[in-house]
Amino acid sequence: MATINQLVNSPRKRSVVKSKVPALKACPQRRGVCTRVYTTTPKKPNSALRKVARVRLTSGFEVTSYIGGEGHNLQEHSVVLIRGGRVKDLPGVRYHIVRGALDTSGVNNRKHGRSKYGTKRPKS
């Protein structure tokens, strides 16, 4: 236990928490331009072709971000909005592309969980 004099001379250090999404620069989302759209394979127990895009952000970073949902309309030079949120089985993918914002279309024929995929309410 530190004495009062020791604490007066040098106060207790605050632990600094490292950001999990540094490219967002403490913003909820960031805009960027796709530089490459491609598929990649996940880590070991899983098997798939995951759709990802390399995005150059307005903050100056170039990050890899995941394109969720079935099917997408992204290509090089598409303007996208990205949010934080990693993909556990894709190393280095720490961001998600927001569906239904800017140049990204929503998922077609989506009935449940529509708000997460930028889909409008279907005409009943």
Swiss-Prot record:
Pfam families: Ribosom_S12_S23 (PF00164). InterPro entries: NA-bd_OB-fold, Ribosomal_uS12, Ribosomal_uS12_bac. NCBIfam families: rpsL_bact. The modification 3-methylthioaspartic acid is found at residue 89. With S4 and S5 plays an important role in translational accuracy. Gene3D superfamilies: Nucleic acid-binding proteins. Residues 102-124 are annotated as: Disordered. The gene is rpsL. This is Small ribosomal subunit protein uS12. It comes from the Bacteria. The keyword Oxidoreductase does not apply. GO terms for molecular function: rRNA binding; structural constituent of ribosome; tRNA binding. Part of the 30S ribosomal subunit. Contacts proteins S8 and S17. May interact with IF1 in the 30S initiation complex. GO terms for cellular component: small ribosomal subunit. Residues 109-124 have a biased composition (Basic residues). Keywords: Methylation, Ribonucleoprotein, Ribosomal protein, RNA-binding, rRNA-binding, tRNA-binding. GO terms for biological process: translation. Signal peptide: none annotated. Belongs to the universal ribosomal protein uS12 family. HAMAP family: Ribosomal_uS12_B. PROSITE patterns: RIBOSOMAL_S12.
